Amino acid sequence: MLFYDFEVFKYDWLVVVIDMTEKKQHIIINNNEELDSLYQAKKNDIWVGFNSNHYDQYILKGILCGFDPKRINDFIIVKGNPGWKFSSLLRKIPLNNYDVMLNLDKGLKWFEGSMGNNIKETGVPFDIDRKLTEAEIAETVKYCIHDVEQTIEVFLQRKEEFNGRLELVKLACKGKALDLSLISKTKPQLTAIVLDAHRQGDRGDEFDIDFPN
């Protein structure tokens, strides 16, 4: 299981990945090849993030497809579009993504405060119109590591939520080999699969589900 978080700027991007199985920390900065190598080695694992269903997974997939991550970032954050609409190519990158964020959550920083932890904010503005300095990259890496560590803490507090999702995945597989890609789906989606629900046209909309009568 890997925990990950991306930070994206106009001319720089970085990701911190903490591999809980191998107890390793990966820090990748502006290196598409290194990211691809890590993905190829770990694509069958579960990747865990905070709000990763709506953001980080699409940054990861986009970089692997050769897109500029800032374009994807702005498509999602600035224009308010769902990440899956950016390009159909993103669907060709399988990822067992699990998002610890729930619908009513107020954000990772809110969790940090509610858990009694220090809230860390980066001093580097995300709209900076130049390459980051070495000092700014170091500060952003430190901030990103902190966010991943907080994501791990949220996951541990919500372990039962994950276990419940995993049980639904097992039921959805109906005795066949475990398909971990299903871990990305919401509980209603998994319940629909278990109940043999069907979609009315596959538009790629994760909330468009038709339950059987």
Regions found by a protein language model. Give the residues of each.
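Conserved RNase H-like, two-metal-ion catalytic cores of nucleic-acid enzymes
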Residues: M1-K79
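Generic structural hydrophobic/aromatic packing signal, biased to beta-strands
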Residues: Y4, V15-V17, N97-V100, E112, ...
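Exposed alpha-helical structural elements
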Residues: E34-S37, I59, G107-W110, E139, ...
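Active-site-proximal helix-loop-helix substrate-binding element of RNase H-like nuclease domains
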Residues: W47, S52, Q57, P69-E149
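Conserved "right-hand" nucleotidyltransferase catalytic core of DNA-directed polymerases
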Residues: N117-T122, R130-N213
